[in-house]
Amino acid sequence: MIQVQTRLRVGDNSGAKELMCIKVLGGSMRRYASIGDIIVASVKEATPGGVVKKGDVVKAVVVRTKKEIKRKDGTYIRFSENAAVVIKDDRSPRGTRIFGPVARELRDKDFMKIISLAPEVI
């Protein structure tokens, strides 16, 4: 569960290291985002020479959450950190590599490019 002011690690090589959620997209009073949801975030920490800089406002898709999510078969999945991938307006990733595992739920939300770049899909 990601809400406003939540800090997330970045799971790609776009140049950002840490993001802070400033808005959860999808409804006027929507409070929480989970895996596969799009957020608007501010870059709080970035690497020099990256595509995005500190202070940039970007869109990102949540790929890992510490809060478990229930699957249709009754199993739960959770990760050790909150992480997101910076995306463009056409929902494709800004970076060219994805780091760490991502959840299978991204396939249902049509983030196929992220799924194909990820080293592990859980």
From Swiss-Prot:
Q: Which GO terms describe its cellular component?
A: cytosolic large ribosomal subunit
The record ties this protein, via NCBIfam families, to: rplN_bact
Q: How does the annotation summarize its subunit structure?
A: Part of the 50S ribosomal subunit. Forms a cluster with proteins L3 and L19. In the 70S ribosome, L14 and L19 interact and together make contacts with the 16S rRNA in bridges B5 and B8.
Q: Some GO term, biological process aspect, for this entry: which one?
A: translation
- Keywords from the named record: Ribonucleoprotein, Ribosomal protein, RNA-binding, rRNA-binding
Name the protein family.
Belongs to the universal ribosomal protein uL14 family.
**What's this protein's function?**
Binds to 23S rRNA. Forms part of two intersubunit bridges in the 70S ribosome.
**Native species of this protein?**
Desulfitobacterium hafniense (strain Y51)
UniProt-listed SUPFAM superfamilies:
Ribosomal protein L14
The answer to keyword Ribosomal protein applying to this record is: yes
Q: What is this protein called?
A: Large ribosomal subunit protein uL14
Taxonomic lineage from the root? Bacteria, Bacillati, Bacillota, Clostridia, Eubacteriales
| Recorded GO MF terms | large ribosomal subunit rRNA binding; structural constituent of ribosome
**Could you confirm whether the keyword DNA repair appears in this record?**
no
Which top-level group of life is the source organism from? Bacteria
